[in-house]
């Protein structure tokens, strides 16, 4: 059995780490490189960086900080933000990233997933899915351009359909960003995770809602996700990664202990 992964998420805007609630009202957390090093030192399995306004602004993630992060950490990291071409991805990988993640650009051009997977291998290609539960319809829908409140829109895709589509096109991993739960710290949406797990054959990463160590345990034990991504509980030092891993190991979760 592969070890479960603990993955801090760093949302980046204008060279700094930000954090919002339900993808709104972002506050500044701090500088990118010191936070990345802190999480690596605490025992994170990997890091994810989202340049949250790159896609909506029509630009590619700023690559200067990618190189600086690669210099100070020795764990894998994934970068996302406005990647629309093989050339965009190649440059980010050449600066030291281990994976690239695409979200809104994949919705605009689903063939991008296949082209990137064919060029770099599926193990390198992550697809992020921003999913919102609509109380009126009782369905989960995929959103696009969520880094900009003024441009966020609901797409025609229901979440489960898009999960299956991106796998067919070559996604090697899926990060499910559950927008309703984002930043509120009352637990992952286990109902949605279980539904996605049933149709997801590639590694599945839960994102949105972690507030306690028990929430991580529930995601691993009840929804069988491969990794759990979180931001505010780590940024605000509510949970220490080393202590979290010790707790999970004590509960029987296969986890890498530093």
From Swiss-Prot:
One of its GO terms (biological process) is L-histidine biosynthetic process. This is Imidazole glycerol phosphate synthase subunit HisF. It is an enzyme of class 4 (lyase). Heterodimer of HisH and HisF. One of its GO terms (molecular function) is imidazoleglycerol-phosphate synthase activity. GO terms for cellular component: cytoplasm. Keywords: Amino-acid biosynthesis, Cytoplasm, Histidine biosynthesis, Lyase. The lineage of its organism: Bacteria, Pseudomonadati, Pseudomonadota, Gammaproteobacteria, Enterobacterales. PANTHER family: IMIDAZOLE GLYCEROL PHOSPHATE SYNTHASE HISHF (PTHR21235:SF2), IMIDAZOLE GLYCEROL PHOSPHATE SYNTHASE SUBUNIT HISF/H IGP SYNTHASE SUBUNIT HISF/H (PTHR21235).
